[in-house]
Design a protein with these regions (language model features):
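Short loop/turn motifs that connect adjacent beta-strands in outer-membrane beta-barrel proteins
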Residues: 21-36, 72, 100-105, 119-120, ...
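Short glycine/proline- and aromatic-enriched beta-strand/turn motifs that initiate or cap beta-hairpins
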Residues: 21-83
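Residues that define the transmembrane beta-barrel architecture of outer-membrane proteins
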Residues: 33-35, 57-61, 87-91, 104, ...
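Transmembrane beta-strands of outer-membrane beta-barrel proteins
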Residues: 37-41, 63, 73-75, 93, ...
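Transmembrane beta-strands of outer-membrane beta-barrel pores
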Residues: 43-49, 79-83, 99-101, 112-116, ...
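Glycine- and aromatic-enriched membrane insertion/assembly motifs of diderm outer-membrane
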Residues: 56-112, 218
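Detector for outer-membrane/organellar transmembrane beta-barrel domains
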Residues: 124-204
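Outer-membrane beta-barrel "beta-signal"
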Residues: 218, 222, 241-253
Length: 253
C-alpha cells in the first residue's frame, strides 16, 4: 500500500510538472507568434441541440481544441457522442474572426458538421454571425451586469435534405445571482426550414420550431464548471423535442 502511495505521489508530481511545462510552452508560443492554444472537455447527461435531442436522452461526453490568434482569427474542432450515425459521433470544425467594436463583441465564421461513417450528403456548413455585450446595472450592485447576445446562422443543404435554406435565430441573456457564485441564463431560438421537400423526416415533418433553455450555472465545482438546464421545444413534434432537464460538467485548460 505504501508503495502505491509513493507511485501515486510520483505520478501526480509528474503530472503537475507536465502541466507546468505545457503552460510554459503555450505561453512562449503566444508571446512569440500571437497564437494561443486551448483545450476543453465536457460531459452532459443529455445532448440537446437547438431543442432537438441528439443522444436520445443518453449522456454525451465531448472534447475540443481551439487555436486563436491575437488578430482575432481562430480555428477549432469539437467532437461529441450522438445516438444517430454509423459511429455514433459528431465532429465539428469551425473557423472565424472575432473582434470588439466599442462595447460590442462580434463573431463571424463557418461551422462544418461532419458525421463519420455517413455519406457526405449529411455533412453541412453553417455560416454564422453573433454580437454580444455586457450591460452594467449598478443600481443592483457595483459589479453587477447582464450579458445579452444575438446569434444568426444560415445552413444550405441542411443534413442533405432537399431544402434550399435553413435559418437559425437565437437570443439569450446571462446574469449572476448577487451574493452567490451562481448565474442564470435564458436562451430562446428558432429553426426555420425553408420550402421543405423530399426528406421531410430529417426535419421531423415540420418547417420550423422554437426552443428555449433556462440554465442555472453553479460556477466551479471540484475543478469543473457545472450547470443544470431545463429545455423545451414547443413547436417540435416527436420525442426528440420533448422537454426535460440535463446537467453538464466541463473543464478548459
Amino acid at each position: 500500500m505504501k508503495k502505491f502511495y509513493v507511485l501515486l505521489s510520483t505520478a501526480l508530481l509528474a503530472s503537475k510538472i507536465s502541466y507546468a511545462e505545457l503552460d510554459l510552452s503555450r505561453e512562449s508560443l503566444e508571446k512569440a507568434t500571437g497564437i494561443s492554444v486551448g483545450y476543453n472537455t465536457s460531459w452532459s447527461s443529455h445532448y440537446v441541440w437547438r431543442g432537438e435531442s441528439q443522444s436520445s436522452k443518453d449522456m454525451s461526453p465531448a472534447i475540443g481544441v481551439d487555436l486563436g490568434h491575437s488578430s482575432g482569427l481562430y480555428l477549432g474542432a469539437w467532437s461529441g457522442s450522438i445516438t444517430n450515425g454509423v459511429y455514433g459521433a459528431e465532429f465539428d470544425v469551425y473557423g472565424g474572426f472575432a473582434f470588439d467594436l466599442g462595447p460590442f463583441s462580434f463573431d463571424i465564421g463557418d461551422l462544418y458538421y461532419l458525421y463519420p461513417g455517413e455519406s457526405n450528403e449529411t455533412s453541412f456548413n453553417e455560416y454564422y454571425f453573433s454580437v454580444g455585450t455586457e450591460i452594467p446595472l449598478k443600481m443592483i450592485g457595483e459589479d453587477f451586469s447582464v450579458s445579452p447576445y444575438l446569434y444568426l446562422a444560415y445552413a444550405p443543404k441542411w443534413f442533405g435534405a432537399n431544402t434550399p435554406d435553413v435559418f437559425y435565430t437565437e437570443a439569450g441573456i446571462e446574469a449572476p445571482i448577487p451574493g452567490t457564485p451562481l448565474s442564470i441564463s435564458y436562451t430562446y431560438g428558432n429553426v426555420d426550414v425553408d420550402d421543405l421537400e423530399g426528406d421531410a423526416e430529417k426535419a421531423n415533418d415540420v418547417d420550423s420550431w422554437d426552443y428555449y433553455y433556462v440554465t442555472l450555472g453553479f460556477g466551479e465545482v471540484l475543478g469543473l464548471d457545472a450547470s443544470a438546464t431545463y429545455h423545451n421545444a414547443p413547436g417540435y413534434s416527436g420525442d426528440a423535442g420533448q422537454d426535460g432537464f440535463f446537467v453538464s460538467l466541463g473543464h478548459e485548460w
